[in-house]
Amino acid sequence: MASDRPIFILGCPRSGGTLLRRMLRAHPRIAIPPETRLLLDAYEHRGAYGDLRRRANRQALAEWIVAGAGTRFDGLGLDARAVAEEIVAGPPTLGSALEIAWRAYARRLGKPRWGDKRPGYVQHIDALLRLFPDAQLVHVIRDGRACVADLKGTSWWRMGVYHAIATWTQAIDAGTSAAERLPSSAYTEVQYERLVTDPESELRRLCTFLTEDYAPEMASQRPEPPAEAGLERWERELCEAVMNERLRAYGYEPTEAARPATRHLARYATITAHRRLAARKRAVLDAHLRAAEPQPVASCLS
């Protein structure tokens, strides 16, 4: 029996999430829109909307969803007023309000099942599952060296190589944790290289996970040309030193790169320490927000 569980695509940026989104979008039952900035932003600022059992608070949330700066709602091609009215009339939870927007997108395309894609979701799996407890998570994984090289070649990545390496390793670690604690029906992994070289086999496996029939048109999608800028020798050395066991776990063989210079290892260690501290601060803030929640946040629609 086909499922209506929401689907979330996540992973390190430049891992192939956009390709997988296009593949799933080609399925006759699945609608996954271009990236928005709705879910994480709404969740992190949920305290600002107060008790959503109050109509005025639902109205404020609805107005932010359809017209807030930077939400990218306009990319969904929806009637903003109609969606806002549906949110105000809908169940009084944050997850429900968000789901109404994505359901409207799927409805516009004549499809019964919705999903969403954003790489950063991999660091916010707990938030996803609080909002959508029945969600199915699809983690797209790519050779970390290729991800870092690809990030270097993009115009929007301004955080440098150290942060690119840390972003990949933290995504892998978050996925490992999810795989250990979530049921196999809630989390799966897809490797970019297999999507490119043998898309039908990888997509058939994914459709089994999603409880969907395989649709041949999914495999007709092709990857965009990579933005790879290439790795300098010290960058490859650092990648392989840091990623080594994680690469091997997914069948990516390290080369015989030399040990990276101490200054590069030290700089990387400093950056990862700062990132861990920032993550702990976010966790403390989230705990305070949870304690102050006037009612559950989970969607009542799924």
Task: Map each language-model feature to its residues.
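PAPS-dependent sulfotransferases, especially Golgi type II membrane carbohydrate sulfotransferases
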Residues: 1-8, 91, 152-155, 176-180, ...
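PAPS-dependent sulfation machinery
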Residues: 32-116, 121
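Active-site micro-motifs of SAM-dependent methyltransferase domains
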Residues: 26, 38, 146, 194-197, ...
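PAPS-dependent sulfotransferase catalytic domain
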Residues: 86, 102-217
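A generic secondary-structure signal for well-formed alpha-helical elements
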Residues: 27-34, 210-214
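ATP-binding Walker
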Residues: 15
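A conserved segment at the C-terminal end of the G1
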Residues: 18-30
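P-loop (Walker A) phosphate-binding loop of NTP-binding proteins
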Residues: 12
